[in-house]
Structure formats: structure tokens, C-alpha cells
């Protein structure tokens, strides 16, 4: 998250946020990197962020965790998710156990709307450069090159899903699917 006197950028994980932050400047150092807009006082400032197709986003998150371990992820966890594969990670991992208290899901598995509720503009990762340029013009932000940071390497997301895992994502990420109109697209 970046907060200025006139605007707020809300960093939704795996939706181009690191690239946008690099282009805009440094994020807050006070623990707000992946905070929802509701965590701070908006105070009349414009707020914006980005969403990503949830089927693509979940695969990107999985691939990123397999390729680049993040603290506090241990090498054993990284090997476990590699060995068991994407579907296991998505559906059987401890993150989605039965009875998980709604609203307390692990931060990267929450609906993207949890971060972005109250934003004045929500751009699409799929049109990141165009949306970023538009935002810069709208809010008087000096436009800088938009780098591609934290990219993960994998085939088109559709090749990783079967009917069951596809429906699982549709159910868990219904808010952004309905709001933005995302669909599962074949590669």
C-alpha cells in the first residue's frame, strides 16, 4: 500500500502490485504492504487497486510459492506443495480446511474485494499498463515505466484445472468474478 496526501494505492497480492509500487515509489514501512483499504482512514483521498482473474491468480500464487519461498515458508513446505501439485495445494491445503472462520482466511486466499472495498477505481491486471497510465493521468501522478516484478513461470492457467478445482475457485472468489465479469478461459 502506498499512501500520499491525495491518493492511496491498495496492493492486492498477485495482481501486479509489486510492479505498480516500484513505478510509484516505496510502500509504507509500517506493516501496510498488503493491508485492505479499510485498515486506514481514507480521509477524502482517491483510492485505487487492481484485480486479477482468480483462476490465473491462484495458479500464479502457487507457482510463485513453488519457485520463490517466502518467509515464513519453509523449504519443507515448498517441497510439499511441489510434490502434491496445484490441485492439492488449492483444495486440500491447510488454508481451506472445513470450518475455517470466514474473514480469517490466510491473507493471500481472501477475495480480492476484501482489500479493494471502497476503492474509487479498480483496474484489471489483464490491462495493467493501460489502467496504470489512465490512473496516472487521472490523479496527476508522474508516469514511470511499469516493470514486471515477481513474475512466476507456468503454462496458461486453464491447463492446471479440472472441473472440480475450477468450481472451487468460482465458489471462493465469487465476489470478484461477479463484479468484474471474469470467466474461466481456455488457453
What are these regions (language model features)?
Residues 1-187:
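Membrane-interface amphipathic segments in extracytoplasmic regions
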Amino acid at each position: 500500500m502506498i499512501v500520499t496526501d491525495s491518493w492511496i494505492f491498495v496492493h492486492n497480492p498477485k495482481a501486479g502490485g509489486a510492479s505498480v509500487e516500484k513505478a510509484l515509489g516505496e510502500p509504507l514501512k509500517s506493516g501496510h504492504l498488503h493491508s485492505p483499504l479499510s485498515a486506514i482512514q481514507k480521509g477524502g483521498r482517491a483510492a485505487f487497486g487492481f484485480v486479477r482473474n482468480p483462476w490465473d491468480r491462484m495458479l500464479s500464487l502457487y507457482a510463485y510459492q513453488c519457485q520463490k519461498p517466502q518467509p515464513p515458508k519453509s523449504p519443507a513446505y515448498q517441497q510439499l506443495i511441489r510434490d502434491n501439485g496445484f490441485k492439492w495445494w488449492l483444495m486440500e491445503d491447510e488454508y481451506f480446511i472445513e470450518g475455517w472462520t470466514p474473514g480469517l482466511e490466510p491473507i493471500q486466499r481472501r477475495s480480492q474485494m476484501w482489500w479493494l472495498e471502497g476503492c474509487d477505481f479498480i483496474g484489471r491486471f489483464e490491462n495493467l499498463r493501460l489502467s496504470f497510465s489512465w490512473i496516472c493521468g487521472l490523479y496527476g501522478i508522474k508516469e514511470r515505466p511499469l516493470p514486471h516484478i515477481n513474475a512466476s513461470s507456468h503454462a496458461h492457467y486453464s491447463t492446471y484445472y479440472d472441473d472440480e478445482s475450477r468450481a472451487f475457485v468460482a465458489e471462493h472468489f465469487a465476489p470478484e468474478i461477479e463484479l468484474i465479469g471474469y470467466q474461466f478461459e481456455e488457453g
